[in-house]
Amino acid sequence: MENRMISLERNTNETQIDLTLDLDGSGRYEIDTGCGFLNHMLELFARHGRFDLVLTCHGDVEVDYHHTTEDVGIALGQAFARELGDMRGIQRYGSFHLPMDEALILCAVDLSGRCTLNWDIHCTTEKVGDFDVECAKEFWLGFARSVPATVHFVQFAGENTHHILEACFKGAGHALGAAVKIDEAHKDEIPSTKGLLV
């Protein structure tokens, strides 16, 4: 099977994004978004999902990181959508409980063709460094809308905001890594009784 790799650009008046994603990679990454914390989260996502991800974003970070974070989520979702197409042959579902020290997060995904984000995450601070914590939800909302996909994050424990968000991105990597795997026994089938995912 050929590697499932895609490159895309997404340019607006607020951000310019170049992205290459290999769904069948080994977890290699080169990421520069202009936001150190977002870089860190995307590196964790790629490593734990075993995706190869090369991404640069030039955004209006002199304002804040909102546009950069949201638009990177949108672009990453678009990359998944374009590469997976009609979702033929994939497992479709993935879930993972990720412990990060005192934090415990569940991420569950359904590459369903329908957008839902359940963000049941309760951070204890509004910022990690200079990153606004609320931007993490905007990232995953942009991603879920662009695939489109159903994505659930549920927090069972956690006090340290960095640990909570790190567990979210690592868990999402594991869950999406499982969801995009090819089902060798049914690789020519769309994983739905409807015959269509929408």
What is the meaning of each model-derived region?
Residues 1-198:
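N-terminal intrinsically disordered, cationic/polar leader segments
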